[in-house]
Curated annotation (Swiss-Prot):
Signal peptide: none
Taxonomic lineage from the root: Archaea, Methanobacteriati, Methanobacteriota, Thermococci, Thermococcales
InterPro entries associated with the record: Taw3, tRNA_yW-synthesising, tRNA_yW-synthesising-like_sf
Entry's EC annotation: 2.1.1.282
Family to which the UniProt record says this protein belongs: Belongs to the TYW3 family.
Protein's UniProt name: tRNA(Phe) 7-((3-amino-3-carboxypropyl)-4-demethylwyosine(37)-N(4))-methyltransferase
Keywords: Methyltransferase, S-adenosyl-L-methionine, Transferase, tRNA processing
GO BP annotations listed: tRNA methylation; wybutosine biosynthetic process
Function summary: S-adenosyl-L-methionine-dependent methyltransferase that acts as a component of the wyosine derivatives biosynthesis pathway.
Amino acid sequence: MFLYEKNFDLQKKKALESLNDALEKGLVDSDIISLLNKINSLKNYFTTSSCSGRISIMQMPDLGDKLNAIWLGKWHREVKIEEVLDTINKHDGGMLWFMVHSPILHVSAKTLEDAVELLNLAMACGFKHSNIKSVSHKKLVVEIRSTERMDIPLGSDGELWVNESYLVKIVSMANLQLRRTKEKLRKLEDEIQKLKK
């Protein structure tokens, strides 16, 4: 028996305490709470982190410098062009990026069989970039991710490289992608009870 199987119940207890703390502080995306509760109700699984998918605008000092980047705007819902334009006006230096990231969930599984079962279910629900993120003596983690993603440079050092009509088009595409990811989350929530308890 692997250590992660022996320590699973203790790890789950700690993870659920952390989740409850995050819920009380309003740090969990509201549209994913129901799915998290369903996963955590399963005997052989628990969630360790999650994001329900987002549209964001980031200011980055240098290309690839995410460590020192600043979120100018972040939404876990569809956005209006006016919100994006207002947020872009906050840009005062470095590179300006418009991004869409798909939902991501990290789920600990009790056994490798449980992990594979969850991975197959997630992929069948459209989360094609899902994988077994970590297999070690201490933990076994499935990462549930989809393919939807946009990373678009908009400008640099206060200069905008694109016009408003282009922004209208990318906001429309971003909202469509986010809508698709939310549909996948709902499908996963509907299907998750197929996993053994």
